[in-house]
Design a protein with these regions (language model features):
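Sequence-level preference for short, compositionally simple segments enriched
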Residues: 44, 136-155, 160-517
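Signal-peptide-cleavage-adjacent N-terminal segments of secreted and extracellular proteins
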Residues: 1-72, 197-220, 224-240, 250, ...
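Extended, amphipathic alpha-helical segments that serve as helical scaffolds
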Residues: 40-127
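Functionally engaged cysteine thiol sites
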Residues: 19, 28, 86-87, 91-94, ...
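Generic preference for well-ordered alpha-helical elements
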Residues: 12, 25, 58, 84, ...
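Amphipathic alpha-helical hairpins/coiled-coils and adjacent low-complexity
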Residues: 81, 99-102, 106-161, 168
């Protein structure tokens, strides 16, 4: 055997071994066989090659979706255009996270593992979101255009899943063996993750704010609308103080470093009433949409007043990394909060809704929040609907020290309906409710299937720990393989400080948190 053949066999053996840890090993091997050289034999270069392939395949021509739009024969041409526009945006956001992942891999995969896990997982989420949008058109899957888009998104998802699986191996290997201890936070730092800098921490806690601009409806500020203030934002951290009032606006921003501070969660309110029944696509119904990173909100409300008859009607659509909502109110009915992707932290925030009113695929922790069930249009309520599509994603919803209760409109009639802690939107849905107060609005079964998705019961991860109240008993909970009543050794993994599948947005060492069980 020649040296070249031996080298080739060694390389092939190596990639077959590495690819055996992925969900799509055949595609993994096919991808890496195109990168046969000595420099690619290092583990890091294999992962970079896989991400590079995802990037290359994600760089679709600008005409890609518009061509599909013109080919689709649909009654609602406006709806088709909205969906294809949304797909273009999702692909742009996916590409951004893939490119950030590649740069982080090239710098230091071990040091940056948390970021890489989050960004690759988000890229997957954005790809799946495009597919979901296309499927929401209600056209037959036999439609060739629909099939092409769905197949393309599935292919991209498989390409992206493979490097994520390999990065997760690095994360598991480097994670401290004694990872179930309880972290506490020194008191001067408050209850915020370490990526909330000391400056921003003080900003969130300060009784008065030194704002860059002031918004006031009566003309006493720099601007009369929140939209105008955000348009003027510049710099790394731009603080906008919004005086008391109800601001009827529909806002969308991709700017990084925006901070909104109001006079109180029910005193300063940004509100809208767009809804799916009006013909607007689900994501576009949001009163406030944020895709820029580092968004912070304090003492302000985000509402959608479409009511239950409006069907899907979002108050918030959040695809921002390192996001904080502190002492806010988020009010709607169906699909109130779209926690779409990336790392999100909610503290002392009131969230109102009916069906799936916290949904999406972010790595999100809700601490000390008040989750209010409203009277539904349909037959039942479900608080969470997590959209995790890949077991390698570090995503999920953790509800800790929350209060779950019926609202004033629901309490008198709650005996007529069932309410649940959540249902699995996607195959690997993950939600944990712990140390929370649960009133008797919640059904004794606790959780409910997604219609037509009974198989998810084996692949989802739903768990409860140390909850109290008349709705907290677990003896009659669902008997699914994926449902767990956990102990403290497992529950601690889902605290703000130590959410194992979401450690990319939390410190791995050093800073201590108050998130104890």
């Amino acid at each position: 055997m020649s040296w070249g053949a031996m080298h080739s066999n060694n390389y092939q053996n190596k990639i077959q071994k590495e690819c055996s840890f992925t969900r799509f090993p055949i595609l993994c091997v096919q991808t890496l066989m195109g990168f046969e050289s000595t420099k690619h034999q290092q583990h890091i270069h294999l992962m970079s090659a896989l991400v590079n392939k995802s990037i290359a395949e994600s760089k679709l021509p600008t005409s890609y979706f518009s061509n599909f739009s013109s080919q689709l024969l649909a009654k609602d041409s406006q709806g088709v255009r909205a969906v294809t526009d949304h797909c273009e945006e999702m692909m742009s956001m996916s590409l951004k996270r893939l490119e950030k992942s590649l740069l982080a891999l090239q710098n230091s995969p071990t040091k940056n593992k948390d970021d890489i896990q989050t960004w690759l997982g988000a890229a997957l989420t954005f790809q799946q979101t495009c597919k979901d949008s296309v499927n929401s058109l209600g056209l037959s899957e036999r439609n060739e255009v629909i099939k092409k888009i769905s197949q393309k998104m599935d292919y991209l998802s498989q390409l992206t899943s493979n490097p994520l699986a390999l990065v997760n191996r690095i994360a598991r290997a480097s994670y401290p063996k004694n990872s179930t201890y309880n972290r506490r936070l020194d008191e001067e730092q408050g209850d915020f993750p370490n990526w909330v800098s000391a400056k921003n921490r003080k900003l969130l806690q300060a009784p008065r704010i030194n704002a860059n601009v002031i918004v006031a409806q009566d003309g006493t500020g720099n601007y009369r609308t929140v939209s105008e203030a955000i348009s003027a934002a510049s710099g790394n951290r731009f603080v906008i103080y919004v005086k008391a009032g109800v601001y009827k606006e529909k806002i969308r921003t991709n700017k990084d470093g925006i901070t909104l501070i109001g006079d109180g969660k029910y005193t300063t309110i940004i509100t809208g009433d767009d809804n799916a029944r009006r013909g607007t696509s689900m994501p576009a119904t949001a009163t406030f949409t944020i895709t820029g990173d580092g968004f912070i909100a304090r003492d302000i409300g985000f509402h959608n007043t479409a009511g239950p008859q409006g069907e899907q009607a979002l108050a918030l659509n959040v695809a921002s990394d390192h996001t904080v909502f502190y002492r806010c109110s988020i009010a709607g009915y169906q699909d109130t909060l779209y926690a779409l992707a990336l790392r999100q932290f909610y503290r002392d925030t009131d969230i109102y809704g009916t069906i799936d009113f916290i949904f999406g695929n972010a790595a999100a922790v809700f601490q000390n929040c008040y989750l209010v069930l409203r009277r539904p249009k349909g037959s039942y309520n479900a608080i969470t609907a997590n959209g995790r599509t890949d077991p390698g994603q570090n995503t999920g919803f953790s509800l800790q020290n929350c209060k779950i209760a019926a609202g004033s409109d629901y309490a008198p009639v709650k005996h007529k309906y069932n309410s649940y802690l959540g249902r699995p939107w996607k195959q690997y849905s993950r939600a944990v409710v712990m140390q929370s107060s649960i009133d008797d609005s919640i059904s004794s079964s606790g959780w409910v299937e997604w219609p037509g998705a009974g198989g998810y019961a084996k692949t989802l991860y739903f768990a409860e720990y140390a909850n109290v109240g008349p709705g907290a008993a677990t003896s009659n909970r669902v008997k699914w393989p994926g449902f767990h009543v956990i102990g403290p050794d497992v529950a601690v993994k889902f605290t703000v400080a130590n959410f194992i599948a979401g450690t990319s947005w939390l410190p791995s060492t050093g800073v201590i948190f108050d998130g104890g069980l």
